[in-house]
Each structure stands twice: as structure tokens, then as C-alpha cells.
A protein has these predicted regions:
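Short acidic/glycine-rich loops and adjacent helix/strand connectors
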Residues: 1-173
Length: 173
């Protein structure tokens, strides 16, 4: 199974493929703006980092955070995680609108750029990372199970997230 995960991609923000000696066959696809890359970029921008370039900082900040039920509940009110994810409620009108939506949702803007000492920002990064992992692992597990395989190849900008890769590797084992 090959899963491409991107902000926009050439045509799809997420696509799932089955591969064999004859080539690749598309199993599922999700068009932008329903994009995990846009979701992660929106939170990246909200926390004061450059979207489509500063996502590694968000991933690093997540390591300093903890689960926060309040943050998770609010984020899940605009983001549906899982195999049939839908993030258009947050990012459907673009990153600047998504940042405004996050400011309204949380009633605050964190320090710019966010630092590990900002517990709230670190917790938001942690919850964001967890939702991304939950969604991608669900996609991988669902399509690997359907194809009867345990091997997966991730591609695209979202797949550069090393913490995500660790979770996918552990789930596929």
C-alpha cells in the first residue's frame, strides 16, 4: 500500500494506492482543501511558525506537550479524525481563515512564535500531532487490512513527519 499525504499535491491531498508488479492502482483519494497538510500548516501558522516550512517546529514542540481534553474537544469540533477524515471545517477557506478560526475557537493567540515554555501551545501542538497520527494510522491500517498486506510506503510532505512515521511503523508491525 502506498499512501501519499500532502498539502495539495498534484491532484489529491491524500491518495491511497495498491501496488504490484503491474504498477499502482488508486484505491481512494481526497481532494484539497480537505487536507491533513493544510490542517497541520494551519496550526503551525497559529503558533507563530511559517506554514509550509515550519511544520518541523510544530512537531518538535509537540514533544513538550501533554494530552489536554479541553484543547482536544475544541479541535475535534472542527476536525474529524480517522480514515474518513474531514478538516474542511477548519481549513476549507485557506490558512489565514483557519488561523482566525483557531483564534476564535480558543479565544487566544499564543506567544509568537510559541516556545516549549508555553504549556498551552505545547499542549495544542501535542494534540495536533496526536490527531494527525490517529488519522494516518487509521488510513494505513484500514487499507493494509483490505489489501491483506503489512507493508506501506508513505510519500508527500506530511510523510516527512518522523513522529508520524514511528507511529505508522509500530502499527504496521
Amino acid at each position: 500500500v502506498v499512501v501519499t499525504l500532502d498539502g495539495r499535491g498534484n491532484r489529491w491531498s491524500t491518495a491511497v494506492w495498491a501496488g504490484d508488479e503491474r504498477g499502482l492502482r488508486r484505491l481512494a483519494s481526497v481532494p484539497p482543501p480537505n487536507s491533513l497538510g493544510y490542517f497541520y500548516a494551519a496550526v503551525t501558522a497559529y503558533l507563530g511558525f511559517a506554514p509550509f516550512g515550519g511544520e518541523g517546529r510544530l512537531m518538535a514542540l509537540a514533544a513538550y506537550g501533554d494530552d489536554d481534553p479541553e484543547i482536544e474537544s475544541r479541535l475535534r469540533s472542527v476536525v474529524d479524525a480517522g480514515v474518513d477524515y474531514d478538516v474542511t471545517g477548519l481549513v476549507g477557506e485557506g490558512i489565514p481563515s483557519a488561523v482566525s478560526r483557531l483564534e476564535a475557537l480558543f479565544g487566544r493567540g499564543p506567544s509568537r512564535p510559541a516556545a516549549p515554555s508555553d504549556r498551552w501551545a505545547a499542549n495544542l501542538a501535542h494534540v495536533t500531532q496526536a490527531l494527525l497520527e490517529e488519522t494516518v494510522v487509521a488510513i494505513v491500517e484500514t487499507y493494509c487490512d483490505r489489501q491483506g498486506v503489512r507493508t506501506v510506503c508513505l510519500a508527500g510532505g506530511v510523510a516527512l513527519n518522523c513522529k508520524l512515521n514511528k507511529q505508522v511503523a509500530e502499527s504496521a508491525a
